[in-house]
Amino acid sequence: MPSKIEKICLLLLGFTAASNVNAYSHRRAGDTLHHRHKHEKHNDLTDSSYEPLTLSYNDTQIQQLQRRDTVQCAFPYGDKMVAVTPDEGNAGWAMSPDQYCTAGTWCPYACEPGYLMGQWDPNATSYTYPESMYGGLYCNSDGVAVKPFPSKDYCYPGVGDLSVVDQTGDGIAFCQTVLPGNEAMLIPTWVAPDSEQVLAVPDISYWDETAAHYYVNPPGVSTTDGCVWGTSANPYGNWAPYVAGANMDENNITYVKLGANPIYLDDSYWSTVKPTYGLALECEGDTCSGLPCYVDPRENGVQGCPEGSPIGAGGACFCVVGFQQGTTAKIVVVDYSEEMASSSSSASATATSSAESSIATSPITSSSNVVSSISTSSMDSSAVSSYSVVQSSLASIISNAYIATSKSGLNSGVSTLLASPTSSSTFVTSLLRRSSIDGSASSSSASLAVPTVSSSTTGSLHYKTTTTVWVTEVFTRYLGDDSTPVTSSSIFSTATEATDTSVQTSSAIYDSSSTSNIQSSSSVYASSTGALSSNSLSSSTSSVSTSYIPNASSSVYASSTEALSSNSLSSSTSSASTSYIPSASSSYEVASNSSDYYSQTVSSITASGTTSSTSEIVSTPASNSNTGSLNGTSSFNVNSVGPSSSQTTPTSSSSITGSQSLKETSSPAYVSSTVSYTSSSVDSSSTYNSTGSSSSDSQSFSGTTYSDPTTTITSEVSSILSSPTSMQSSVSRPQSSGDASGFNTIFTSISQSSDGETSGYTISSNSSQNSASEPQTAFTSSSSSATPTITQSSISTSVSSQSSMNSSYSSPISSNSVTSSTSIISSIASSSYTSIPSISSIASSFFDASGFTSIYNGTKAGFSSSFALASNSESGASDVLSSTIAKPTFKFSTSNSGSTSYSIPSSSSRNEGTTSYSSNITVTSSTLKPSLTSSVSTASSYIASSASSNTLSTEPKTFSSSSTLSESISSINTNSLTVKPESSLSSSTTSGLTSSSSTIPSSTRSESNSESASTSSASKRSSSSTSLVQSNPVKTVVSLESYKFTTSKISLVKNPTKTYTVTDVETNVVVQTHTVSYVEHSTSYTWVHTTLYEYADVEASTKSTSEPSAKSKRNAVSTFETVFLKSKSSA
């Protein structure tokens, strides 16, 4: 009979050699079985040089385990059973996540803490492969999990009085290995903070008289994270620092083992890291032998066993305690973190630098994706409008000749501004989300806050070959005389072709005047994170803290994190605060974490300038006139620091003059005035060139150019006055039964514009519907008037200022070019009637005697209103727009004073096998301080738009579209639909204001990532064409989440004819044709017809000269919205 000492030394001493460790969170089917601790009988002699139990599946077995189409057995959820990852392929069984419980296999399971699995193959009687895998229930050919021992429970309580006590205050995860089974540490036992939990101890009745084996995770690691087949990235699972084991022999003696984990010692990094917790075995009774038994990391780290303890396989120390029945034992988990931290505080490996201004802020810690949160204090209850847009592209469109586009390339995240010759101003930022396409991970993020706008951009590597084309069509149709109106069913119809993809569309039409808040604060946050040895950081920060806002502040943050490499960050930031801020402050932080492999340097160029201007408008009621003036100056200086740099230092100056006159007439009447201010600048451009190289890779960063073009300010004031007893109405049409023709036109204005290339007319109208039946459109409005007051007014001011930054970056491993351009525009001193729709309805708002009333879904919202736009984004977030508007006045004086700062860095970085790039951000802002003699009404309205293009060209499929307009048809100006595609959808979409003729932006992308776009238009006879290159064979799927809103301004036409065709240029087949002739009549209706074309995949082998089949043709979903226009007599 073996002696007690022999039994003690034999507890869990068999260790197998290390083999492959999988990178998955659990070990997958087919991995080599190992955890370096053999579950051997503890009362039999075992040579310490026991041969490794290295078990592998063959290919046939892997296919059998992973096949999903065979018969599978469901997890029974019996008494005391615990499901392991029930949402994975194992469906709750104690197996690898991608291993299935299929017919003809044994499926082990986990039990609650203190309980053991009571079922296994009765014929599996030895610890040899594959018998050691046959635990749990047998899955028969009918898909039923069968008990091999019908009279025994699924789970039964263990023996021995052994428990775990947590003294760390964070809780401990003990993870038991599955045997018989794949021996992964999947069976969870959670010891709550400062509590005690029983451990399951098997006796000789358990399978093959084997012991229970546990991995002891660090404090605070959950069983979800710790009871897995881990990796060396974290000391969890089979990489945990400590192991424990327990069993009872035939003499009812319980043996408990504590020791170091050999796999933890194998790792060159973890073997040098001392855990901050230890294990100690305590007995209550007089039969314990083998004490003291502990693992104390304070001196020797994970090898902190008592002096003289035996050494097992892998050089791991251990100790064993045995005790008889009647004695209880506890494994106490001890916290040494504070004691070890105080003794090694000088060995901290984190380097952090920070600079603080008048207020303290928290350090920005290194992370792969950081989005800053910017808070703007309000001015007062009557002059603030703030918008918050989450996970959406955003654009502020001030004038009517803009197309704002955001493009994403395969290895870059770029925001680009495209403007027509008559454009005013636009701010564009986009959200790009891509996954990694190589072995490393790289991401960048930037967050910008501007007056009334808060947005964010994030980007990571991803691409998907999808292509989408939008065509927006606006035309006028002759409907006959008043006696034969078209019914609502024919106007509001929806045409849908057969489609494999369900696409839901909706749209709304509204009329509003864009305005902006007086001023807000702005700040910039930029960060970049590299993984492994891929290092690239280029941060550009600029902050302007503007005046007239109480408690305004601005912050600049820059952070960098590098793994397995080093960088040094030298960043220069600048900020300026103007006067009129009761409590203004700024703070800056620069943080960097680095190692000792190599270094890189980031240098920067800083620029600062000041501007000031004053304006005053005085109203003289006696003469019904207003006069005013605006004057100001500005200066700009540039300085640079950094190696190999050269620059020019221009000085710019500008002068602004203007005047205004206002003529009032009796009510009701139109009162309008136009004020134009033009600013000219001198030497308003600067060039900065910097070259730098890192060791061995000879990379370069050069050619940075900054420009500041001429600024133009245009202000236009218009309003309508109503009588005390009636609402202003130009046209009224009686309600007809069954149709939607009962509209009252409240206000109609006509204007003409021409820029030398295109020309056209626009008509805007604001209408209310008097239909007693359910409206067919999403447009409703109402107005009330008790005393002579303004029923509708608009004062809009736009400031156009565009800045651009172009940079290129190259490396010998991979070559990419990155171009970024960002403009941030503020609209100043604006007051307007504003209407913002939702998905299902549209809200109209008017001024009344009480100041402002918002009518939204039948609810009077008082002085403020908010509207939510639905968004089916991955995070479930919604875009929320809010505004506060007060009663407008015509008498006010203003002064303008502000300053602007720029920070334009260049960088040189080391690149080891992955692509990195640099990006720059430039911020331009202007400020205004009102001195109010009475309340000033301000509001803001923004239209979001974005476009992206990313396709791979294989077998191209080309379509062309053309439209022809004859005679004197006036151009139609439309704010096209705003679409927020899925974040994972990489497609070609376009939104924004389009020109008079319907044009389709085109883009092609070859494997070299080249892009091109072409459109053409003319004033009288206009044609436009585009070519679309589609990837084949590629499945193209379009998932449209929502339309936000549509704004249309449409003009009456006279005797035009329009033909619109879409042609498959490969087969020369006309896919779609519209030809409409017009006859001038006393009544005219206009609707917007928007069509989404989806191009399904067309295999190269199925191409023919005939028209594509219905399944491969585009799928169209159309919606119609109607706007009633003022009737016009025939010529």
Curated annotation (Swiss-Prot):
GO function terms (MF aspect): beta-glucosidase activity
Glycosylation sites noted in the Swiss-Prot or TrEMBL record: N58, N123, N252, N551, N593, N631, N689, N766, N806, N857, N920
GO-annotated biological processes: cell wall organization; polysaccharide catabolic process
Role according to the record: Cell surface beta-glucosidase involved in cell wall biogenesis,.
Species of provenance: Schizosaccharomyces pombe (strain 972 / ATCC 24843)
Class of this enzyme: hydrolase
Localization annotation: Secreted
Entry similarity comment: Belongs to the SUN family.
Keywords tagged on the record: Carbohydrate metabolism, Cell wall biogenesis/degradation, Glycoprotein, Glycosidase, Hydrolase, Polysaccharide degradation, Secreted, Signal
Keyword check for Kinase: no
Pfam families the UniProt entry points to: SUN (PF03856)
Segments for region (Disordered): 609-819, 893-918, 977-1031
Biased composition (Low complexity): 623-715, 726-737, 764-773, 780-819, 893-909, 977-1027
EC number: 3.2.1.-
First and last residue of the signal peptide: 1-23
Annotated protein name in UniProt: Probable secreted beta-glucosidase adg3
Compositional bias segments (type: Polar residues): 716-725, 738-763
Listed InterPro entries: Beta-glucosidase/SUN-like, SUN
A GO cellular-component term linked to this record: extracellular region
Main location: secreted
